[in-house]
Amino acid sequence: MKIFCKILPEQEIREKLKSIEHVDFSLFVESLPQTNEDLSELNVLVLIEPNGYFGHSDWAIKNKDLFSLIITWDQRVLNNCPNAVFLGFGHTWFKPEQYTKKHDKKFQISHLCGALLKTYGQSLRHEILARENEITSIPKKFFPTYGDRHNIEEARIGKEEVFGDSQYGIAIENFSHKGYFSEKILDCFL
């Protein structure tokens, strides 16, 4: 059993799959094989992010025969890979103890811009941040960023600070794709 994952701790996945560790398979979650040694008898690819970030969907279509199964929401992959199955994607980074606790909500609006500026949605978030002073009818908390987005625990705490005490939040996705949304939508419901 080989685990390659960029979004979850590989050790945590390995522990959950311990009962099938004897099976010769490789699991690639938002990660691609780098060498033939990464591949096994059974190979599963899970695509999460839109192709516009890393080009993984394009790569998967070209290399579909390497995989026993491709799990994705991406319609192009589903149309071009007979070994692909649909799994709608939407998630939150928050843990149950964060989204089940009572937050003291105030009449205000929160907005988290983020540091990246690669997509149309990201440019819209930057535009809203730049025009923050035009919003005068409601109290607001606007944040250019929230800390280290590569540290999931710090990101969870930062996003709770951004959205935890506001009745309203502005959520703009990076991309618009059928079958996909990211944590940005759910963050506002904290």
Language model features with spans:
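Nucleotide-sugar donor-binding catalytic core of glycosyltransferases
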Residues: 1-190
